[in-house]
Amino acid sequence: MATFEGTYNDNTQALKLAIVIGRFNDLVTSKLLAGCQDCLRRHGVNTDPEGAQIDYIWVPGCFEISLVAKKLADSGKYDAIICLGAVIRGDTPHFDYVAAEVSKGVAAAAFQTGVPVIFGVLTTDTMQQALERAGIKNNLGWGYALSALEMASLMGKI
């Protein structure tokens, strides 16, 4: 029996990535993006928007992330897709609908295409919680980038 495991440094200069970012709550999503870019840069990926390694796609909000991620995955051009967003609970059930649908949609995009689609959408009760998860001490954007690198590596091995 073989054991397969992805790594973070398997020829990262050859990867083609897409990052889909929800513009709603951009105070948070822009910080997640910065953390994601920092991680990718430190692992040898050219994060320049004018470069050839990463396409950045901004969408109005989290609900639109799944559709765009699926279209990108269907294109066959990407080794991994990272989806970044922030859904913050309010006074209505809107939070529940958006959070549920974006998580299902991102998972479906990966299952239906075989392309790693990383779920980097924060679901928090308050803006403060979201900012803490996208801050200097603990920016989850970094972890989402690592997941993309590891999954792209793993999918190339199995």
UniProtKB/Swiss-Prot annotation:
It comes from the Bacteria. One of its GO terms (molecular function) is 6,7-dimethyl-8-ribityllumazine synthase activity. It catalyses: (2S)-2-hydroxy-3-oxobutyl phosphate + 5-amino-6-(D-ribitylamino)uracil = 6,7-dimethyl-8-(1-D-ribityl)lumazine + phosphate + 2 H2O + H(+). CDD domains: Lumazine_synthase-I. Its EC number is 2.5.1.78. Pathway: Cofactor biosynthesis; riboflavin biosynthesis; riboflavin from 2-hydroxy-3-oxobutyl phosphate and 5-amino-6-(D-ribitylamino)uracil: step 1/2. SUPFAM superfamilies: Lumazine synthase. One of its GO terms (biological process) is riboflavin biosynthetic process. HAMAP family: Lumazine_synth (MF_00178). This is 6,7-dimethyl-8-ribityllumazine synthase. It comes from Picosynechococcus sp. (strain ATCC 27264 / PCC 7002 / PR-6) (Agmenellum quadruplicatum). The gene is ribH.
